[in-house]
């Protein structure tokens, strides 16, 4: 019979995060700007996700009809130390184009390391309208606590099957349109419209996850 006695519920439901950020920015010349940063982040408390279920390889499967019952919920350490290091480089090509690049390396004491690189090329159609194609690449090495479905053993102290903590690559392609009016000629009631931003991104991950993302934003200034 199914006996979920192995379930270890989380007594501590709190989480505290502490961060220190260091950054440096420098205008190299009339066309180039560089900025670098490093962050130190410490998390303490409940870092597991209670709805993530675990199925052990060394425990017999139990079912209710066709539904398999979990052997435990995700168990992860109650501390995590993260260090991301990155840089941004912007290059003014001409009055129409600006090249924007970004790179970040990330590492933590759960065994995850990752690289992120992105490029954006805004094109100024008019004084007010800009389009900006972009591309972002992400690659990650899995946590030492990750294993897929029915690969963990019940003797392990920590375990997760959350694929956000697995090894994967991801690509993101996008296109955006921005309207900017520093003089706020257009109004909505008592608010002057300063900026309108519309973006579409397609996200694709090597583990099969696909997403289409549309975002819309507006900046207003209250008329006096």
Over which residues does each language-model region extend?
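Solenoidal tandem-repeat scaffolds enriched in leucines and small polar residues
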Residues: 1-53
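Outer-membrane beta-barrel channels and translocator barrels
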Residues: 27-31, 94-96, 126-128, 182-184, ...
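Generic detector of bulky aromatic hydrophobic side chains
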Residues: 1-3, 8, 19, 23, ...
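General secondary-structure edge motif
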Residues: 4, 12, 16, 69-70, ...
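Face-selective signature of the C-terminal outer-membrane beta-barrel domain
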Residues: 27-38, 81-92, 97-102, 195-201
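Short beta-strand-to-coil "C-cap" segments at the C-terminal boundary of structured domains/repeats
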Residues: 218-224
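Outer membrane beta-barrel transmembrane domains
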Residues: 41, 47-79, 84-88, 107-118, ...
């Amino acid at each position: 019979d199914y006996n979920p006695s192995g379930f270890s519920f989380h007594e501590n439901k709190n989480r505290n995060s502490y961060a220190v950020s260091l950054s440096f920015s420098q205008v190299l010349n009339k066309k180039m700007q560089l900025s670098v940063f490093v962050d130190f982040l410490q998390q303490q408390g409940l870092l597991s996700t209670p709805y993530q279920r675990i199925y052990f390889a060394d425990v017999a499967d139990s079912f209710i009809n066709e539904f398999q019952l979990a052997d435990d919920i995700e168990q992860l350490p109650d501390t995590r130390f993260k260090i991301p290091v990155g840089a941004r480089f912007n290059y003014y090509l001409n009055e129409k184009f600006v090249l924007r690049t970004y790179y970040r390396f990330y590492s933590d004491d759960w065994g995850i390391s990752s690289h992120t690189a992105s490029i954006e090329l805004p094109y100024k159609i008019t004084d007010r309208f800009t389009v900006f194609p972009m591309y972002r690449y992400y690659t990650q090495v899995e946590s030492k606590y990750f294993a897929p479905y029915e690969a963990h053993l019940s003797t392990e102290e920590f375990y997760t099957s959350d694929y956000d903590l697995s090894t994967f690559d991801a690509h993101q392609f996008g296109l955006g349109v921005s309207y900017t009016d520093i003089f706020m000629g257009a109004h909505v009631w008592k608010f002057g419209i300063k900026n309108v931003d519309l973006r579409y991104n397609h996200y694709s991950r090597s583990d099969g996850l696909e997403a289409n993302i549309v975002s819309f934003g507006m900046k207003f200034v209250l008329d006096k």
